[in-house]
Regions:
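C-terminal and inter-domain tail/linker signature
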Residues: 1-132
Length: 132
């Protein structure tokens, strides 16, 4: 399994509340600044943030941008569905995550989220339903 496949599999399980693979691939000293919350997050913080936000988000297709022994770059698409909260239509974003490794474990990562004014599933060969 590649680093990208392992990363995606770990977080897909995490989105469902199973963080066992996440725990195995992250370094105990992992830290990351979370721009959504404004905090320097450790792994436990990331789990809480993910669990909370996943209630209104669908994480779609992932694509590997770059992978080496010490670095992974991945892109994914996100559908944010606030209809149950405020009745609004879903919106979409593209995320790029840079993942840094130390001794084979994830030590740091940064995610940049870019809003989209279109539904990416209409332009690519996948459907949101495949990821819900």
């Amino acid at each position: 399994m590649t680093k990208a496949e392992e990363y995606v599999a770990a977080w897909r399980l995490g989105y469902r509340g199973d963080f066992s693979l996440v725990d195995r691939i992250y370094h105990p000293d992992y830290k990351s600044f979370d721009y959504r919350t404004g905090i320097e997050a450790n792994l436990e913080d990331d789990k809480v943030i993910t669990s909370t936000l996943n209630a209104v988000m669908t994480i779609g297709h992932f694509q590997t941008i770059y992978e080496s022994e010490d670095f992974l770059g991945v892109e994914c698409f996100v559908k944010r569905n606030y209809a149950e909260i405020d009745g609004s239509d879903p919106d979409y974003a593209a995320r790029i995550t840079a993942v840094h490794y130390e001794n084979g474990k994830i030590i740091a990562q940064k995610t940049s989220t870019n809003p989209l004014d279109f539904d990416p599933s209409e332009y690519f060969e996948w459907k949101w339903e495949d990821f819900e």
